[in-house]
UniProtKB/Swiss-Prot annotation:
Residues 222-272 are annotated as: Disordered. GO terms for biological process: cytoplasmic translation. InterPro entries: NA-bd_OB-fold, Rib_uL2_dom2, Ribosomal_uL2, Ribosomal_uL2_bac/org-type, Ribosomal_uL2_C, Ribosomal_uL2_CS, Ribosomal_uL2_dom3, Ribosomal_uL2_RNA-bd_dom. HAMAP family: Ribosomal_uL2_B. Belongs to the universal ribosomal protein uL2 family. Residues 250-259 have a biased composition (Basic residues). Residues 261-272 have a biased composition (Basic and acidic residues). It comes from Baumannia cicadellinicola subsp. Homalodisca coagulata. This is Large ribosomal subunit protein uL2. The gene is rplB.
Amino acid sequence: MTIVKCKPTSPARRHVIKVVNPELHKGKPFIPLLETISKSGGRNNNGHITTRHVGGGHKQRYRIIDFKRNKDNIAAKIERIEYDPNRSANIALVLYQDGERRYIIAPKGLKVGDQIISGHHATIKTGNTLPIQNIPLGSIVHNVEIKPGKGGQIARSAGASVQIIARDYKYVTLRLRSGEIRRIHSECRATLGEVGNAEHMLRVLGKAGANRWRSIRPTVRGTAMNPVDHPHGGGEGRNFGKHPVSPWGKKTKGKKTRNNRLTDKFIVHRRS
């Protein structure tokens, strides 16, 4: 992994910092594991904007990722590491001994030619997947399930990881990177190691156009608008003299938005 600071040959290149990984596959992705994505532009079926700051961007195809890792007791070899435009983490194409190929999230330290395996009795090794009740305390894991068999939902982005800190008969306690401590069922699966490409956070896009390639449109401040457009709009100067709110008058910047009371009992300590 190399951090490259571009020379200031133009105003757009002056601040660009790239993260270059020479181990990434330079060819095309594995075609049978691709799906088309149609862009919504942030609109719903009525054509109304439901997600602001979305639109345009380069055409992409979705890579079908195996988050469940449920092909047990069949060894697989890492064929190549690839870039995925749909996530911050890199992905790995694995070839199972029975000839099937799947994409997985590429863990840190996993290289081409390495062997991985899933199952209840898999060895404790980076890239292997097994029920979290069979993983030693203190281990670092990623791609953790919340419901058994549903597929990994926690710690899937670049550099993400979770630590196992306690275990009882039916549940395992995890410490998330956010500081939250929560319990999940001991039959849930997790993959050993942390997600690779942690240097993703060091990149600097350098220009607005790089965000537009990623379908991200500009974010206009409420204080820069007129009163008809935003509660913060209008007035002399930049002060709006009230608690920050959304364009629809809902409190923002610190207001709690979580509303899933059924799973509150599994959160031992909220994130700080």
